[in-house]
Amino acid sequence: MQTAYWVMVMMMVWITAPLSEGGKLNDVIRGLVPDDVTPKRILQSLISRRRFDGRALFVPSCIWKTCPYG
């Protein structure tokens, strides 16, 4: 519990320190995430890890509440 508390405190300091130097919150948050991490890349990574009977699972692309596959 004590470790989790200090991790939380350090994260707050890590985020707020650049803000006190005049940085914008959006820029600070973007600086914490690597450039190659995008929603598309994350989805591809998750799909490539999931296997079923040696075949890749098919993940339909659905838009909002309409899904042509189900």
Swiss-Prot record:
Molecular function, one GO term: toxin activity
Tyrosine amide modifications at: Y69
Entry comment describing in which tissues the protein is expressed: Expressed by the venom duct.
D-tryptophan PTM sites in chain numbering: W64
Alphabetized UniProt keyword annotations: Amidation, D-amino acid, Disulfide bond, G-protein coupled receptor impairing toxin, Hydroxylation, Secreted, Signal, Toxin
Functional note: Moderately activates human somatostatin receptors (SSTR) with a preferential activation of SSTR1 and SSTR4. In vivo, does not cause behavioral changes in mice within a few minutes of intracranial injection, but causes a progressive loss of movement thereafter. Four to five hours after injection, mice recover, even with the highest dose tested. Shows antinociception and antihyperalgesia activities in two mouse models of acute pain, most probably by acting outside the central nervous system.
Family note: Belongs to the conotoxin C superfamily. Consomatin family.
Free-text comment about domains: The cysteine framework is C-C.
Name of this protein: Consomatin Mrc3
Taxonomic path: Eukaryota, Metazoa, Spiralia, Lophotrochozoa, Mollusca
